[in-house]
Design a protein with these regions (language model features):
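Short, structurally constrained coil/turn elements
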Residues: 57, 161, 221-223
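N-terminal secretory targeting modules
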Residues: 1-134
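Short C-terminal domain-edge/linker segments immediately following a structured domain
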Residues: 70-75, 132-136, 166-170, 201, ...
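Short N-terminal secondary-structure initiator segments
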Residues: 74-80, 133-138, 170, 210, ...
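Serine-esterase "nucleophile elbow" of acetyl-processing enzymes
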Residues: 93-97, 101-190
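Alpha-helical cap/lid subdomain in secreted, periplasmic
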Residues: 172-175, 179-252
């Protein structure tokens, strides 16, 4: 299975966070091939469409190929409109030079199986991790990639390709409220730096009550690792909804 963390190690996770961390968000397969065509066959778990996600972002595939040192978009694996079995071309009609490929997995679904297909006789081999360092990002739907058009368009993935850094996406849409289990996950995770998008979901009261303990728990295991906290975004849903505006204003 392509899961972000071993959820069995964290029984204190809520059912929603457990489900989200089984998703393949931010995970990618790196390989080399000289094939002119690349296809994929994959199996997902959920059948219901997402309310704020494209079908490709939710359970499709997103391929990039390195050209002149840069990752360039190459194609998508479009999933079936219903069901959990998917098969589709990802890119076709290429030349036969050897290519380094980066295939992102779905943002909002769990992958039960994945097969990558090439032309008969074409070489297909695993490639080494192309990214240096390890930056772990824990956050809200913004980090998770909600409303991104494709799996590779979540900001953690975009930064990874642009900077050459390895970003680990631990976003949990709507759930990241400085809970102690997120602090435990960070404390037990190897990282060169942490980025926290942890002010978007909680209330001002939750931030006041939880932030100090959250940081203390992580610092016990990572005394010198950079902890980078992002400011919450401005929610345009509060342009006219006074309750939502007050909720956000209280955090500033």
């Amino acid at each position: 299975a392509f899961q972000r963390i071993d959820v069995a190690r964290y029984p204190e996770l809520t059912p929603t966070v457990t489900r989200y961390y089984r998703y393949s968000t931010g995970l990618a397969v790196v390989f080399r091939t000289e094939s002119r065509n690349i296809r994929a066959r994959w199996t997902t778990v959920n059948q219901l469409p997402g309310a704020n996600s494209t079908l490709i972002a939710q359970r499709g595939l997103d391929l990039y190929i390195r050209r002149d040192g840069k990752w360039v978009f190459a194609g998508v694996g479009v999933p079936s409109k219903s069901g959990t079995q998917h098969e589709a071309p990802v890119v076709e009609h290429m030349d036969t030079t050897m290519k380094e490929c980066l295939l992102y997995l779905p943002l909002h679904d769990e992958i039960a199986a994945l097969e990558i297909g090439t032309d008969e006789g074409a070489l297909l081999e695993a490639a080494p991790d192309p990214f240096r360092h390890r930056i772990v990002v824990i956050g809200s739907s913004i980090t998770h990639g909600t409303s991104a058009s494709r799996p590779g368009m979540a900001y953690a993935a975009r930064l990874g390709r642009a900077l050459g850094f390895g970003f680990v996406n631990l976003g949990a849409s709507g759930q990241c409220k400085l809970d102690t289990f997120f602090a435990r996950i960070a404390a037990e995770t190897r990282a060169d730096a942490f980025v926290f998008d942890t002010f978007s979901n909680p209330s001002a009261q939750q931030i006041d009550e939880r932030l100090e303990g959250f940081v203390r728990r992580i610092r016990e295991s990572h005394p010198t690792t950079p902890l980078i906290f992002l400011q919450t975004e401005v929610r345009e849903s509060g342009n006219f909804d006074l309750k939502k505006r007050a909720f956000e204003d209280a955090k500033r």
